[in-house]
Amino acid sequence: MSKTTEIIRLTEQYGANNYHPLPVVLTKGEGVWVEDPEGNRYMDMLSAYSAVNQGHRHPKIIQALKEQADRITLTSRAFHNDQLGPWYEKVAKLTGKDMVLPMNTGAEAVETAFKAARRWAYDVKGVEKDKAEIIVCENNFHGRTMAAVSMSSSEEYKRGFGPMLPGIKIIPYGDVEALKKAITPNTAAFIFEPIQGEAGINIPPEGFLKEAYNVCKENNVLYIADEIQSGLGRSGKMFACDWENVVPDMYILGKALGGGVFPISCVAANRDILGVFNPGSHGSTFGGNPLACAVSIAALDVIIEEKLPERSLELGNYFIEKLREIQHPDIKEVRGRGLFIGVELHTSARPYCEKLKQEGLLCKETHDTVIRFAPPLVITKEELDWAIERVKKVFAGV
């Protein structure tokens, strides 16, 4: 029995069946390349759902991890630590916001935004107690916690987890008129993804982000952007909202914020919003821990110093152009921004992902019929050409 087979056997025997991974085991990674126990190399075209924008084991980020781990890793928020303040400042300046609240996972950050929006509605906007409403979009993916699941339009995500949280309205993605109709005096916030990742790399109609922003401003509704996947360079801009020069009231960040090395997430907003929290109203034992903050500072430095948003834009345009040259009856559409790309098929994407894996290219289906290509942003043009040849080969053979 191979090492790969044995590890998969153990995983399936003892692990809860809440994921459906491709049959590959990864033991090493560097840059855009990963390796299995038998020494086979693969190109990573998923980047851990955009958490590894800086590439696997970026030297600067790993060095920050090692140096901080040699000093102190966790203090809790009962005490100050020497990494949190500098990290706050870095994220505040990057987002242009007054305040930042740290958590660990993207779903926790979404939960934080949800709570902040509701409390803001009561304490600032003056909504009657327990009447606050949140507007979200169809086919969203904001995580797996109860608030996130309650916001989902997927019945499968909700099945068996009811009752759902009240006060949530779901509108079609990219529909400004539907947003206008959904708003009432009780509306606290509009929470959205500027590009829907899990839904299949869905890009809203041109002008939607700006128009929706204006509607929210006219109605005193918080405009909250979930940039967990689309942010930090993935879409070819620092934030996907930058495509329409929109600055949301609140950013929700995660994934690449930790450089693929240590989990860290946050929400960033001005004082009139995050000021609704007081000691004891929200928190996390690990949120803002010194190890995560040190890693995140280095992760953000890499994004800025290596101009990863600009790289993503240039190489993404090139990759999309090459993908669109592939002619095959199963291909319905190629779409994307930066290196955040979806190839929508007329059929299931899973068999294609399995065949690409056999050719040394790792990607994952999303929304059943979409192949998602989202490599680390440090990928080179030559490596993209290598990937294109594998994609062409797979489609030519099907």
From Swiss-Prot:
Q: Does the keyword Amino-acid biosynthesis feature in the UniProt annotation?
A: yes
Q: Which cofactor does it need?
A: pyridoxal 5'-phosphate
* Cell inner membrane keyword on record: no
GO CC, sorted alphabetically, is: cytoplasm
EC number annotated for this UniProt entry? 2.6.1.13
Provide a Gene Ontology MF annotation, just one.
Answer: ornithine aminotransferase activity
Known catalytic reactions? a 2-oxocarboxylate + L-ornithine = L-glutamate 5-semialdehyde + an L-alpha-amino acid
The record's listing under InterPro entries reads: Aminotrans_3, Aminotrans_3_PPA_site, Class-III_PLP-dep_AT, Orn_aminotrans, Ornith_aminotrans_bact, PyrdxlP-dep_Trfase, PyrdxlP-dep_Trfase_major, PyrdxlP-dep_Trfase_small
The entry sums up its family as follows: Belongs to the class-III pyridoxal-phosphate-dependent aminotransferase family. OAT subfamily.
Q: Which GO terms describe its biological process?
A: L-proline biosynthetic process
TM spans (from-to):
none
The organism encoding this protein is Geobacillus sp. (strain WCH70)
Q: What is its main location?
A: cytoplasm
Sequence positions bearing N6-(pyridoxal phosphate)lysine: K255
Q: What is this protein called?
A: Ornithine aminotransferase
The places in or outside the cell where this protein is found are: Cytoplasm
